[in-house]
């Protein structure tokens, strides 16, 4: 391991030239999929990886009423939402992935209510979603936990606010940004 004061010098006989294809990222795709809830326009996403969490999020969106077509061969997703989606994200779909909680902010912003199962599927260990909930409350959401579900409402809509997370949370930041877009 190099310290900050050391350097690594590579001497080679040829300049590097060429192109490489970068594969799509699950961690970029999942919040984009959740954010599609906010629009009734057709959305096309390219360079989508064919991994379990992505296919589970597609199942969730379909269950909620979105029309989602995924071509693993083309690495492309097309999404068109009906005028009104279901605001329930059930346990049977969220039990295997943490990112399902990202639909909470989108549903609250657009429909002013959501019932979202507490997430599962984390190989890293327990990572609570309290930071998501605290920030959404700061934006005006009423939230309660009941029978393994987050039941949230924002009768008057969510309101913009200044909020600084007490610690870094990529997922909570994504959720609040999505919630702030509608």
Regions found by a protein language model. Name each.
Residues 1-182:
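Structural preference for solvent-exposed beta-strand-turn elements
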């Amino acid at each position: 391991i190099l310290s900050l004061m050391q350097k690594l010098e590579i001497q080679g006989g040829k300049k590097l030239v060429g192109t490489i294809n970068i594969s799509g990222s699950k961690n970029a795709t999942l919040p984009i999929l959740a954010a599609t809830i906010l629009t009734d326009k057709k959305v096309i996403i390219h360079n989508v990886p064919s991994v379990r969490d992505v296919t589970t999020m597609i199942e969730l969106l379909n269950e909620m009423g979105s029309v989602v077509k995924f071509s693993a061969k083309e690495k492309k997703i097309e999404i068109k939402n009906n005028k009104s989606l279901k605001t329930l994200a059930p346990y049977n779909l969220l039990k295997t992935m943490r990112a399902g909680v990202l639909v909470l902010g989108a549903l609250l912003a657009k429909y002013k209510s959501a019932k979202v199962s507490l997430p599962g599927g984390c190989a890293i260990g327990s990572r609570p979603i309290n930071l998501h909930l605290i920030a959404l409350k700061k934006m005006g959401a009423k939230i309660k936990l009941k029978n393994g579900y987050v039941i949230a409402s924002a009768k008057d809509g969510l309101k913009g606010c200044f909020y600084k997370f007490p610690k870094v949370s990529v997922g909570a930041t994504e959720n609040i940004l999505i919630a702030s877009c509608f």
